[in-house]
């Protein structure tokens, strides 16, 4: 990680400097044609492909309900591992609405346009990394923060249940 000043990467990434965000955006988009209508404008980030040590510790208990609700609103379910880095950049650049469980996939928000609406679903102790990044990228950020049903001492973890009315009101 390029910005660890206190020997604690988890703490350091909560608020990345704008210069790092700008540098990443510039370097990784330099020779890309970003406009591409082949990518969905609304999608849900499915973390079913997350490493087993993470996926067993942080899940949406009622994910099938969440996916059903989002599908009715024309959200496509995607796994970021199905896309190259270049295509992930294009995916986020062309997105209008993104919903997903708190996780590293939201780092791609730095490549989004400012009209993106991002909804993060997260355990209540997960921190503000995604929120801070979204705000620095001028993205419209919202979250549903839920007390975990199954809690792990690492505050980013825990299985959460999303209230369908809360989800409906925010999409």
Predicted regions and their residues:
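The feature primarily captures lumenal catalytic ectodomains
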Residues: 1-171
């Amino acid at each position: 990680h390029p910005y660890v000043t206190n020997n604690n990467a988890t703490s350091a990434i909560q608020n990345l400097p704008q210069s790092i965000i700008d540098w990443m955006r510039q370097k990784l988009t330099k020779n890309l044609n970003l406009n591409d209508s082949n990518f969905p404008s609304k999608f849900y980030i499915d973390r079913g492909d997350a490493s087993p040590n993470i996926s067993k510790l942080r899940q949406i208990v009622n994910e099938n309900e969440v996916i059903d609700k989002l599908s009715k609103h024309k959200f496509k379910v995607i796994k970021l591992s199905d896309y190259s880095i270049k295509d992930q950049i294009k995916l986020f650049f062309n997105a209008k609405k993104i919903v997903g469980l708190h996780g590293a996939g939201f780092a791609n928000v730095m490549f989004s346009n400012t009209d993106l609406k991002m909804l993060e679903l997260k355990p209540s102790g997960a921190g503000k990394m995604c929120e801070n990044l979204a705000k620095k990228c001028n993205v419209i950020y919202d979250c549903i923060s839920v007390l975990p049903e199954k809690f792990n001492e690492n505050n980013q973890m825990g299985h959460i249940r999303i209230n369908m009315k809360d989800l409906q009101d925010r999409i």
